[in-house]
């Protein structure tokens, strides 16, 4: 399932993302009324850590969430933090870089990548987590047309894998046939 959220600046798109991934209310003080249901599960009372078991977010500027300068190190970072066995990490990275067509981005300097390549590294990193829900905040921002095509392909692939994808976006043209 792919859901697209679009709206004017200040309409609450970023707030919705923060509600879904738990930043609100854990790190941003806010009064919340009602429930937040994701895939028939009320996540309203779950903290960021609990939500990270099934929700991953790729921010508009992926380099703001990078922890390493090497792309492979970046992709395996979260898997290592979950104490997965090394052979499982290697197999997962191999599987998802093949599925997403990002194998050529392994073992590269993140600072030498284009904006689109950085976005694909971030998507590969979260895809390797095998989450149920992926949230993409303005994923096409500052990408050229070729990078948008690769982004679209990655989103289609995640959809085909049965993932729930929430996209906050202003550029809607590339999402029409996903």
Where are these regions (language model features)?
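ABC ATPase NBD Q-loop/coupling interface
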Residues: 35-50
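ABC ATPase C-loop
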Residues: 126-127
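Catalytic Walker B motif of ABC-type/P-loop ATPase nucleotide-binding domains
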Residues: 134-137
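H-loop/switch region of ABC-family ATPase nucleotide-binding domains
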Residues: 169-170
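Helix N-cap at the start of a conserved alpha-helix in ABC-type nucleotide-binding domains
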Residues: 145-147
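Conserved ABC ATPase signature
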Residues: 109-113, 117
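Conserved ABC ATPase "signature" region
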Residues: 87-105
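Helix-to-loop junction immediately C-terminal to a conserved catalytic motif
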Residues: 21
């Amino acid at each position: 399932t792919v859901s697209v959220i679009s709206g004017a600046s200040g309409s609450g798109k970023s707030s919705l993302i923060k509600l879904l991934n738990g930043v609100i209310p854990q790190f941003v003080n806010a009064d919340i009324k009602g429930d937040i249901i994701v895939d028939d599960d009320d996540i309203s009372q779950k903290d960021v850590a609990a939500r990270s078991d099934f929700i991953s977010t790729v921010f508009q500027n992926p380099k703001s969430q990078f922890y390493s300068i090497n792309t492979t190190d970046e992709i395996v970072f979260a898997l290592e933090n979950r104490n997965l066995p090394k052979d499982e990490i290697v197999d997962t990275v191999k599987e998802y870089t093949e599925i997403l067509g990002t194998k050529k981005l392994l073992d590269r300097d993140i600072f030498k990548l284009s904006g689109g390549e950085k976005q694909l590294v971030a998507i590969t990193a979260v895809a390797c987590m095998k989450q149920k829900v992926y949230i993409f905040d303005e994923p096409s921002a500052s990408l050229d047309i070729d990078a948008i095509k690769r982004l679209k392909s990655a989103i289609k692939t995640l959809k085909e894998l049965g993932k729930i994808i929430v996209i906050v976006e202003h550029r809607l043209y590339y999402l029409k046939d996903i």
